Structure formats: structure tokens, C-alpha cells
Amino acid sequence: MKEVIMKKKIFLLTMIVGIIAVIGACKKSDDSTTTAACSSSLSTTASGTLTGMTSTMGVDNMTGTYNLAWYGATPTAGCIDNVTAVSSMINQSAVPSDTQNFKYQHIITSSTSFTELLTWYSDNNSCATVSGYHATSYTNFTVGDNITMATAPSGYPTYGTKVSYKDTCFMAKGVTDTATAFINAMSNVSGAVTGTELNKEGSGSTYYNIMALNDNHSGTTYDWFYLGPESTSAYPDNYSSDDSDVMYQ
């Protein structure tokens, strides 16, 4: 699980850089219409329900916020403060160098959308002092067929639901100068100013993936969410040990 999640973080960061490379060709932030459209479509407030995912209870729904399960653990409120984990993320340039804790979350924002949010914190072991964040909004969420697998990577179920969603909006903000420098170091991102939120149109790409739920997994009170390796060309037929996520709420 350690290697799975670490590789996924590298994959996500690479994907985000690719997204930004595309949106660099979009209208500049001084176009008020473009900025407003992006801002209005990117919410980090949980609202609504995504329906139709397969689960241990048959068909189930997703609502609220799901947090990354790091090293197989379920840290309080999703605050990942494992020193080894944070150090590894810094060494791989996946988070700013002043990061002490972080959260990686999927937030259901309507019946057809969700937001992927990575927040960095500069305080020690509490996730109280935000140093920065970046988020991507996905809309046009659509549920397809259910699938099963003969086997799946360790920690993942042998079932899933085909889903698709569109990359609509990207935003980022550095509260500390270190976080701002990290954002500006992303490919085709410039002009981020400490304390000011940067909003950009997304790539517009449609992604194909598989998702599944597992209620009260392993006798715990948590509901678990599994997200496969997304693609712009075809639905995956299984989860991946390199670039899939295990999340909980």
C-alpha cells in the first residue's frame, strides 16, 4: 500500500502538470468571464450525491468528502502527518518544501460533479495552518456498466462501475511564499501571487475510469471508495497498483 499511494501521488502531480500545460493556452485571467466561469464551477463544499456505484451492498451512492488512506491508515479528518510520508512527498517534489502535513480529498459537489483537492499545511501534526492548495473540478459525471475482475491488486475489490467525467477547472493558491513558488514552478503556470487564488479553465478532457464502494470494510465504521487509473481513451478493466486510490469517510 505504501508504494501504491506514493506512486499515485507522483502520477497525480504529473497529470496536473499536463493539465496546466493545456490550459496555458486558454484565455488570460484578466478575462472576467472566463475567470468567473471557472470559479463558479469549482467548489470545495460537499453537496449533492453521485449515484449508481457498485458496492458490497449492491448499488450505492457517494456523498460528502472522501480522504486518502495513507499507509493503510485512516488519519483523523484526513490529516496525513506521517513524517516519513511527508518527507517522501517533499523529496519527490509532490508538495512544497515547507509542508508539515497534507490532505488529499475527493469532494462530491453535486449530482454530476466532484472536486479533487490537495491541501498543504505548515503547522506540525494538526492540519490547522494552510500553506497552500490546488484543486481540479470534474463535471459531467456519468455512470456506465458494472464490471467484475477475476483478481485485483491487493487492497482493491474485484468489482467496479465504469464512469466518465470532464476536467473543467483548476485553481491553486499559495499562502506561504514557498507554496507560491511551488505553484509557479508547475509547467505553464506563472503569475501566482502569495495570498491570491489562481483560477484557470481545465483542459476540457473527458476521462474514463472505474469506481467502487465498500461499506463498513473490515468491520470498521468507515465507508471506502476505490478509484481506478483514469484514461482519456478507454475505460480501465481493473485497478492498478501504480495509480489507483483507496479513500475513506
Predicted regions and their residues:
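Short, Lys/Arg-enriched N-terminal segments with co-localized hydrophobic residues
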Residues: 1-5
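Short, charge- and proline-biased low-complexity linear segments
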Residues: 81-92
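N-terminal segment immediately downstream of the Sec signal-peptide cleavage site
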Residues: 40-76, 81-83, 103-108
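General secretory precursor processing signal
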Residues: 29, 39-43, 82, 130, ...
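Sec-dependent N-terminal signal peptides
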Residues: 12-16
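Contiguous, well-ordered beta-strand patches that form the walls/edges
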Residues: 71-78, 92-221, 226-249
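Secreted/processed peptides and extracellular or luminal domains of membrane proteins
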Residues: 32, 44, 85-86, 133, ...
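Bacterial Sec-dependent N-terminal signal peptides
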Residues: 7-10, 21-60, 249
